[in-house]
Amino acid sequence: DEMSRGKSFADALRTRTFEPDEPNYTPRISAVVYADGSYQMSILKSADGNGESVQRYFFDYPQPVAGEGHFISTYKHNGNPIPSFEGEPLCFACPRTIGDFAHGLWQNLNPDNKVSLFARVIDLETGESGDMIFNKYDAVCSDLDDPEEPELLPEELEQLKKLDAEEE
């Protein structure tokens, strides 16, 4: 709501805190990607399990490196209470397709802690998008005929055509 009123990403998140689910106080993770490819990420969490204090961390990527992405996890490992993620977002090499990206991310999340994952690819030239949703308890998917393989972007289709032509 705040961003739709012209406020910044950080200003919008200054109106929020972590989840009030004592003793874990689940962190809230947010990100925004801009049309120029730059992006910002945030984690809002309690001060080492102190529900009276919020800590807000913002990460700005104004000139992202092609093929690289960043990841923030809610928690760093199991515990009682569960300890929140610490440090800077983890850097990783981005797979070529949204399907590879989403499947790889889902497969590498801790099975005891993962609940849901949403991934979206947007063609910046046409604005067309495709979504993938994973849910630990129910198979959920939208915008896709086949939940295992999302629609390909035009450049991905061209690459497949070239590979098919080379094989013939």
Regions inferred by a protein language model and the residue ranges of each:
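Conserved short alpha-helical segments that host acidic/polar catalytic motifs at enzyme active sites
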Residues: 1-168
